[in-house]
């Protein structure tokens, strides 16, 4: 009897563990953004790989997965880089109760990192509180700055500049 009970408990725990590891479906809007970049890469003669460019985390604490698509982590081998002078596009999609996602943030950045339960973007100049008058972008100071959820507008926004952190040397691409 005890052996049967242990077997039942083991089987139930295995089913629970499998459910915990079930793959998360990528919402249509997120997949469309990835596919658009994939097409651009192919048109330039490159080979596209999304790699680690998609993070899935509940950033706004609403119980639904949010999706962070960071183009700085995309590879477009044998073709020009998909970034520009403002860095690479970072798009955050807010997960919805029906499993879909809505774009809730889009901005250029020089990388992203999730620290705790916050998304930090590598930014520079005015976004770091710097006076940029008379400077070219190459002279701007970089920092990392978190996003925060604006529940009223249902979008992510940069948190106050007082929450910025120094730009880590490890973020060099």
Language model features: what each stretch is:
Residues 37-40, 73-76, 129:
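Short Pro/Gly-enriched beta-strand edge/turn motifs at strand-loop
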Residues 17-60, 170-173:
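Terminal domain-start segments
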Residues 4-5, 19-28, 40, 113-173:
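Acidic, small-residue rich beta-repeat scaffolds with periodic aromatic anchors
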Residues 44-45, 77-85, 132-139:
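Short consensus segments that form the blades of beta-propeller domains
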Residues 106-112:
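Repeated scaffold domains used in trafficking and secretory/extracellular systems
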Residues 59-73, 116-126:
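Acidic/hydrophobic-patterned starts of short beta strands in beta-sheet-rich repeat architectures
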Residues 8-18:
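Hydrophobic h-region of N-terminal signal peptides that target proteins for export
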Residues 20-26, 78-106, 146-153:
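Beta-propeller blade repeat segments, especially FG-GAP/WD-type strand-to-loop junctions
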